[in-house]
Amino acid sequence: MSDSGEPKPSQQEEPLPQPAAQETQSQQVCTFFKKPTKSKNIRKRTIDADEEDGDSKSESSILQNLKKVAKPDSKLYFSSGPSKSSTTTSGAPERSVFHYDSSKEIQVQNDSGATATLETETDFNQDARAIRERVLKKADEALKGNKKKASDEKLYKGIHGYTDHKAGFRREQTISSEKAGGSHGPLRASAHIRVSARFDYQPDICKDYKETGYCGYGDSCKFLHDRGDYKPGWQIEKEWEEAEKVRKRNKAMGVEDEDDEADKDSDEDENALPFACFICREPFVDPVVTKCKHYFCEHCALKHHTKNKKCFVCNQPTMGIFNAAHEIKKRMAEERSKAEQGL
């Protein structure tokens, strides 16, 4: 009876044999040749998904259109969408590590580029003029009798380092005295330049030189450097038309014209003319006038010119030029005609 009361081991509790356990372990570790299951249901929903759907029914649902953002696989990557990813749900924008911002002010130099230098030419301490200055300096030192060291006699100082033995027998002891000879290469270009290029409707006169007295082109400017007053054709015609309008309006209103006033001024000028020769103090006989506007008799002027080549009144050179005084001749003719009418 005791044998029947003992519990019998079941088949489930029996331990597996050792080779079978090794086969299962090898199947779990080595999965290189495991074949995929073809009858896998992709659209099958899991239990967790069902539970999440049940919870979402009680809460407010939010629909989001999640798009897969293409990642740049190569350098030739173009995108028409925004630069930031559309899948980000956080409202705060991403901030870059470095942020640059300008002051939004125009950078204007105080000197307007007046102190700018031209750096395209050779440096002034390496050009031909500097080399020539060093040669003259060495020649001057040798001429003064500075003793040389023994090591300096065997030291090669380049093609420009030879002693100038003719330094004491010529006048060109300074670089400024021989700059026009061209013995030290081309002249130094101006380091401070201000280029100006401005043209107006009148292309034959340099506008910069006329207004400011300065031209960036200098002597090479192809336009005329003159600061005189010139009027173009359209301005002359405009002034003439305005003067004609004023003259016609004054004529219609019965106002005296400016020409009449000019005639009065000319009469006053005639009254200012001398009535006698400055030399003989008598009425004019064949009156003449010099370049300095002084009136003499013809024979008095020639007689004085033989002794003195200068004017009798102002002592300016007459250059032997005596023109006919038509104003005095005209006045003398008018006086003669009035005298004849009075008789």
Curated annotation (Swiss-Prot):
It comes from Arabidopsis thaliana (Mouse-ear cress). Residues 35-44 have a biased composition (Basic residues). Residues 7-25, 79-91 have a biased composition (Low complexity). PROSITE patterns: ZF_C3H1, ZF_RING_1, ZF_RING_2. Residues 1-102, 249-268 are annotated as: Disordered. InterPro entries: CWC24-like (IPR039971), Znf_CCCH (IPR000571), Znf_CCCH_sf (IPR036855), Znf_RING (IPR001841), Znf_RING/FYVE/PHD (IPR013083), Znf_RING_CS (IPR017907). SUPFAM superfamilies: CCCH zinc finger (SSF90229), RING/U-box (SSF57850). Residues 255-268 have a biased composition (Acidic residues). This is Zinc finger CCCH domain-containing protein 1. Keywords: DNA-binding, Metal-binding, Zinc, Zinc-finger. One of its GO terms (molecular function) is DNA binding.
